[in-house]
C-alpha cells in the first residue's frame, strides 16, 4: 500500500510540474488571474503576454477560451493574463476598451485603459521576473485597437503587438519614441471592421494595409512589403487561406511590420489548430532588442 501511495504522489507531482498554475494579482479593478508557466523560476526572466478582448458581453476569460493562449504558456515559458476592460453602465452593458475614436468607448468614459494596462504590467513585474524585452500585447477587434494605442503610447515597454481585426488610430500621429514589432491579422470578409477600412458611428478607422504601412513607417521600414508565405489560419476555409506580407527592410532595430490577410475570413474566424501557436512563435521571435540584453 505504501508503494502505491508513493507512486500516486509521484504521478501527481509529475503532472503538476507540466501544467501552468493560476495565480492572481490585485489590479485596482479586482483580482486578475495570472497564468504562471510550469517550471517558472524567479532567477530566469520570462516573457509576458496580455490578451485583450473585443467589444461585447464576453470579456477576458471568454476571449482566452476562444484563442487558447493560456494553454501555451508552459510550452513557451511565458506569463499570461487576459484582463477585463470597462463595462458599459447602460444599453448592452458590454465590456469595452477606451481605445480610439472609432472603437469602442460609446458612452464617453474618461477612464484611461492605457494607464490600467500599464499598471497591470508594472504589478506583474514587481512580483515576477519579467523579461523587459519580451512584453507582448494580443488583441481581438476592440482589443486590437487597444493594443495599438497602448504600444503607441508606451513604445519603451511593448516589444510587439498582434492584432486580429483591430485597426490603428483614426488619425496618424507622429512616430512613437521607440520601434515596435507589429503583426496585423485581418479577414477580407470582416463585416464589423472592414479590411478596406471604414466608418463606425461617424468615426473612421484605417484599412488593414494602411494600419500596417503606417507602423512600418513608424519603424523606419520600407513600405513596399514582400509576400513571403501562406498560412492556414481558419479551419473553415480550404487550404492555405492566408497571405503573409512582410515589411522588414531597413527597419530600426526592434521594429518591423507584418500583415496576414485571411482570404474570405470573417470578423470572428474559426481559428485553425495552428493559429495560436503560429502567433505565439511570431511574438517570441520579435523581442524589443537583442534577447541577450540584461536590461
Regions inferred by a protein language model and the residue ranges of each:
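Boundary at the C-terminal end of the N-terminal hydrophobic targeting segment
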Residues: 20-22
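The conserved beta1-alpha1 loop
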Residues: 50-54, 186-187, 263
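Conserved alpha/beta-hydrolase "acid-adjacent" motif
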Residues: 191-196, 204-207, 270-272
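C-terminal catalytic histidine-bearing segment of alpha/beta-hydrolase fold enzymes
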Residues: 181-185, 206, 218-295
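Primarily recognizes the serine-hydrolase "nucleophile elbow" in alpha/beta-hydrolase
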Residues: 125-129, 133-180, 191
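Acidic beta-to-alpha connecting loop that harbors the catalytic carboxylate
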Residues: 85, 188-191, 196-199, 263-266
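Serine-hydrolase catalytic machinery in alpha/beta-hydrolase-like enzymes
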Residues: 25-136, 146-149, 153, 273
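N-terminal signal peptide c-region/cleavage motif recognized by signal peptidases
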Residues: 15-17
